[in-house]
Structure formats: C-alpha cells, structure tokens
From Swiss-Prot:
Quaternary context: Homodimer.
CDD domains: GGDEF (cd01949)
Localization annotation: Cell inner membrane
GO molecular function: diguanylate cyclase activity; GTP binding; metal ion binding
One annotated GO biological process: cell adhesion involved in single-species biofilm formation
Function: Catalyzes the synthesis of cyclic-di-GMP (c-di-GMP) via the condensation of 2 GTP molecules. Cyclic-di-GMP is a second messenger which controls cell surface-associated traits in bacteria. Localizes at the cell poles through interaction with FimV where it increases the local pools of c-di-GMP.
Free-text remark on how the cofactor is bound: Binds 1 Mg(2+) ion per monomer.
Keyword Ligase: no
Catalytic center residues: 592
One Gene Ontology CC term in the entry: plasma membrane
Official protein name in the record: Diguanylate cyclase DgcP
Record remark on domains: The GGEEF domain is required for function.
Tagged with keyword NADP: no
Length: 671
C-alpha cells in the first residue's frame, strides 16, 4: 500500500472518529433533555398527595446525583404504591362528596315546593353522580345548590307570609296571640300544614330536632320516649320540629327564615374547606335568586374595548394558572411523541418504539410517566449504541467492497495475462505452421506430394485460428460479465452514497434550525458568521451585526403563560424574516434574542433598517382577550472594522443592546 493510500485511510479514520464524537455529544444533549423533562414532569405532578410529592422530590434528587440505576430501582416500587394509594383516597373523597351533595338535594326535594322549582332540583340531583367526579365541578355544584336552596327558602317564606304564620321567635318565646289562645296545640296545625310530609333522616345525615312536647289538654305532661330525647339533645341550632300528638317519634321540619348553604349542617364526610381545597377553587359567592346568569362571551373577540377590530392571528392564549397533570398531559404526550419520532431507531428496536408510542398516545397518566420515561431513556441509550454499531457495520461493508474491488482487479490482471499467453501461443503456432509449409515445399519431389503437404499445413493454420478465436470469445464474455457486475456494484455504492449524503444534509438542516420559530439557530449563526467574515477579508466591503431583544419578555411569560410567549416569538420571527433582504441573515440566538447580519450595508443604512424592524414589531396588533397589548424591542448595532473576529464584534453589539436596555428600552444604540 502506497504512502498516499495510508494517508487517505488515516484521514478517513480521523474524520469518522470526529463524526462519532459529534454523535456522542448529540446523544449526551438528548439524555440531558430527557433528564430535564423528568424534572419538569415531577414538578407538574406535585400537589395531589404528600406521599407522591415525597417520591417526586426523591426522583429529582436522584436525577441531580445522576444515580439513575440504583436510585430508580428502589424508588419506582414505592412510587407505584404511593400513586395507587393516592388514587384510592381520591376516589373515596369523590364518593363522599357525591353522597353528601345527594343527601342535601334530597332534603330540599322533601319540601313541598312548586313544580317550576322541583324540576331544576331533580335535574341537579340526577347530575350529581356524573359532575361531582370532576373536582373542577365541585364549586359550580355548590353554587347551584346554594341558588336552588335560596329559591326554595324564598318560596317557603312567601307561603308562610301569606298564611299569616307566626315568626320563628314568636313560636319559640310565645307572643300576645299565644297567651290568649285557649288551646295550646292550636299552633301545631299551621306547622303541619306548612310541612305536612315527615322527613326521614338519611343514615349519614345528622338527626333532625324534635319540637317541644306540647302538654295534652286535660292531663299532666307525659315523659318523652328515649329516642325523642336523644333526637332533641343531638339537634343542631336553627332547626325546629313539631311532633304530631300521638306520634312522638315522627319528626317534622320547620326551616328558619334566612339560612345560607354554609350554615346548613353538612352530612358526614363533606366539608367546604376539604371540598374546595380538592377542587382548587375559592367558594363561589351566593347568587341572588332574581339574577339570571349572563351568557358567556364569545371565545374569539371581534372588537376590543375601544371598538377597534382585532386580528385573531395576534390573539394571545389565556394563561393556565398552576395546571394539574390533566392540563399539561397533552403537551407532555406531544413532546414525548416528537422526541420518539426524532429517534432514528433500527428495525430491531421498532417493536419497543411502537409499544411505547401506544402507551404515550392518548392514555398516559401521571403515575405511568416515570416508567415511560425510563423506557424512553433505554431507547435513547440503545440508539447511541446502535449508532456505534452502524458505524462499525459501515466500515465492515466498506472493507468488504474494497476487497471485492481488489478481487476484480486481480481477475482483470489474470485475464490480461491469459490474453497475452494466448496471443503468444497463437503466434508460435502460426510460425510453426508457416515454417513446416516452407520445409514441405522445399522437400517436395513431385506435384502430388507438394499438394498434400500444403493442404495439411493450411488445415493446421485454420485449426489454430479457430482455437484462438474461441478462446478470445470466451475471454471477452468473461470480462464482459465482470465489468457488468463491477458497474452494478459501483451504481449501488453511488446510490448508497447519495442516500447517506441526503440523510446527513437533512440532519444538518435540523441541527441548524430553531424548532420553535423556524429561524436558523446559534450553530447556523456561527457557520454563517465565519463565511461572511472570510468573504469580507477576501473581497472587502461593509458588514454589520445587530442584536435585538424583546422588552419585558419575562413579564409576558409570567402574566400570560409560556404558550403566549411562544406565540409572540413566532410572530416576531416572521415579521423580522419577511422584512429583511435576501442577502441578509437572521438567527434566533436564544430566548428572546435575535442576531442579524447585514452584508454590503453601510452603518447608516443598517440603522434605518433596524428602526423599521423595531417599528414593525411595535405595530403588531397583539391583543389578549380583546385588550390591545404593546410589545417593543431594543437593539444594538455595530460594524466590522479591520480584521476583527466575529466574537469581538458580537460583544460590542451586545454591549450596545444593554445600553439601550438601561436607557429605558424600546430604542436602538449604535456602537
């Protein structure tokens, strides 16, 4: 092997080693991204149960210590048990809420109410089972129950006023009319008429009170049965019952004149604090009975408060206040599916990937998230190993093809040697035949013997020529077959090389593109900056570099949510890109910062262009729920001087940007 071949193979080996190191760095970055996703997911899963929160805290500690093998093997069983226990407790609390709300609704249905009030109350009782299983519906159910109870009490109060019934205090302490009444039980029929249906208390509800036992006329007072006494002692304040004469154990309800939902005695297992705390909402204020609920506003406003038309493309999505897992589950599933789609898995790992995709797609709950992430980490690690194996397989196939080429070259050389041998043999045969013919002519004594000798020699010449042609045809056919096979191998290698080059180019474009805005990223900026600096050193001319930063972008994320921030970045990136020239270059440097390269542009022309870009961003009609929202940006611009490196010029433009920030933002500084 020559020295050039040795150097060429050495260069190929070094290039492949460098490529392998780049792949290793890429996989390290993906593993770090997966670890960060685990930490964010554990934070999103907190807040529902103390035991689960402790496991999530331990999970983050394990990820920080990078002790995933031993740490996760001990944590996962405890986490699964804590998740199952938490789910059981949540279901028990939900069932207690359903039972308690149902009992309250049944107590109201037991009253003598008009049909127009009983109908929504029955509908409410039928909907409790389904709606109360969602914690966000609990405050709404309590508000509806409060409104229905207020209407029922108002209806009963109106009926009592029409019947001329005495007030509650008059019945408790007696009045002028009761002193002159001869019959002590005269007030009993009015109470019975107001509530003529005995109410049987539910098993989980507190016992209803019993009224004072009226003294029967014509006889001494009789002692109350033990069960009635127990009911009186356990009766809560605010309830007055009247027992019909002769039936001391039958309980009748006389409700107070003014009572709110939170003053009712709640059945066992239901409390406002626990219910609202689980639902994550504050108690809804009571709604007056005569106030109808206003219709909901349209989802997409057409006009803002000033009556101006707004553009739906610039509408920011509403913020999500501390979402639970159910709110962030679609985002987590989409992120995991995108990560899974981005993995170039070999065919041997496709079944595991499809099984993992089925587990993620549409049915992932938060206590299955950790096992899914573990399996995804295994796939990522196996893909890194697979990349190493693919590279080794590629080198092996390359060696085999080189050996095949060497074999074809050896065969071609052997064929060439055979052709030379055949040519020399044919020449020798011709010379022998001609020499024999000459000798026969000289030795012939008569014409007949000469004729026979010449004929014999000519036949020998023809036979030698036929043999030579046959061998030549066989050799040509063999060489043609070898050339055809060699051409097929060369075509196959060309196709493989094109596919490999196309795949590398696709991966390169993905690596140089920001996935959120579609602009070139920092790596693409570094590559383009080197090209522009080299061009300027070679050809001369002007070259400007500008850095733009969105003002108060953190406040946008905090006030309106990260989805709104992402939408702002996409819109601003589109506005900047469509207003730049074809020769200009813009990249997202990171966060809310953008970098612009302006070749062949003077400093004054670049300043005017940056001012137009800032004005275009400020003119974007951003709005949130119909309210206009002003978003501005600050910028710093500078020009290359002499043989400056790109890093020094970028630092100067960055300092100009910070001067604009310190000077009040929404301005351009020239360095």
């Amino acid at each position: 092997m020559s020295r050039d071949d040795v150097q060429r193979w050495k260069d190929k080996y070094l290039e492949n080693i460098e490529q392998q190191e780049r792949l290793q760095r890429r996989w390290d970055a993906r593993i770090d991204l997966l670890r960060r996703g685990l930490v964010r997911s554990s934070l999103a899963a907190e807040g529902s149960d103390k035991a689960v929160d402790q496991c999530m805290k331990e999970l983050r500690e394990i990820l920080r210590r990078d002790d995933m093998d031993a740490g996760l093997s001990g944590l996962i069983p405890r986490l699964e048990k804590a998740v199952l226990d938490s789910e059981q407790r949540r279901q028990q609390r939900t069932q207690q809420n359903i039972d308690a709300l149902g009992e309250l609704a049944q107590q109201l249905l037991a009253l003598d109410l008009p049909r127009e009030l009983r109908k929504p109350l029955k509908q409410f009782a039928r909907d409790i089972e389904e709606r109360a299983r969602q914690s966000r519906e609990i405050p709404i159910l309590l508000s509806e129950l409060s409104r229905l109870q207020r209407q029922a009490l108002a209806e009963r109060k109106g009926g009592d006023a029409e019947d001329g019934r005495p007030s509650l205090l008059q019945r408790l302490f007696g009045g002028k009319e009761s002193e002159t009444t001869a019959e002590p039980s005269a007030s009993v029929p009015s109470v019975v008429a107001a509530s003529n249906t005995p109410i049987q208390p539910a098993a989980a509800a507190p016992s209803l009170p019993v009224a004072e036992h009226d003294e029967a006329p014509g006889g001494p007072p009789q002692p109350l049965p033990a069960r009635t006494v127990a009911a009186i002692e356990s009766a809560p304040a605010g309830w007055v019952g009247v027992a019909e004469r002769g039936e001391p154990n039958q309980i009748l309800l006389d409700e107070p004149r003014e009572i709110w939902l939170d003053s009712l005695p709640l059945p066992a297992g239901l409390s406002f604090s626990e219910t609202l705390e689980e639902a994550g909402a504050e108690p809804s204020p009571a709604m007056p009975a005569d106030v109808e609920s206003a219709p909901e506003a349209p989802a997409t406003p057409v006009d803002n408060l000033d009556g101006q038309a707004v553009d739906e493309a610039y509408e920011l999505p509403p913020p999500i206040p501390e979402p639970g897992y159910s709110a962030v589950a679609p985002h987590i599933e989409a992120s995991l599916l995108r990560l899974l789609d981005g993995l170039s898995l070999p065919s041997s790992h496709q079944p595991q990937a499809e099984a993992l995709r089925e587990r993620i797609d549409g049915s992932l709950n938060w206590y299955e998230l950790v096992p899914v992430l573990d399996d995804l980490a295994v796939l990522v690690l196996s893909l890194a190993d697979s990349g190493q194996r693919d590279f080794e397989e590629y080198l092996r196939q390359l060696n085999e093809r080189l050996e095949s080429f060497l074999g074809h070259l050896g065969d071609a050389h052997a064929g060439y040697t055979d052709v030379l041998d055949n040519a020399r043999g044919f020449d020798q045969s011709l010379r022998e035949q001609v020499s024999g013919l000459q000798a026969s002519v000289q030795q012939a004594t008569d014409l007949n013997s000469l004729k026979l000798a010449v004929d014999s020699r000519l036949n020998g010449l023809l036979a030698s020529m036929d043999e030579h042609q046959r061998e030549q045809a066989e050799h040509e056919q063999e060489v043609s077959g070898r050339l055809q096979a060699l051409m097929e191998r060369v075509n196959s290698m060309e196709q493989d090389a094109k596919a490999f080059h196309s795949h590398l180019e696709d991966q390169r474009q993905k690596a140089l593109t920001d996935p959120l805005t579609g602009l070139p990223n920092r790596a693409a900026l570094s590559e383009r900056l080197e090209q522009e600096v080299a061009r300027r050193h070679r050809d001369g001319g002007d070259l400007l570099l500008a850095v733009l930063d969105i003002d108060h972008f953190k406040r946008i994320n905090d006030d309106f949510g990260h989805l709104a921030g992402d939408k702002v970045l996409k819109i601003i990136a589109g506005e900047l890109r469509k207003r730049l020239r074809q020769a200009d270059f813009i990249a997202r440097f990171g966060g809310e910062e953008f970098v612009v390269l302006l070749p062949a542009t003077s400093l004054e022309a670049g300043r005017q262009l940056l001012e137009r870009l800032r004005a275009a961003i400020a003119a974007c009609p951003f709005h949130f729920k119909g309210e206009p929202l002003s978003i501005t940006c600050s910028a710093g611009i500078t020009a290359f001087e002499g043989n400056e490196a790109g890093e020094a010029v970028f630092e100067r433009a960055d300092q100009a940007l910070y001067r604009a920030k310190r000077a009040g933002r929404d301005r351009l500084e020239v360095a």
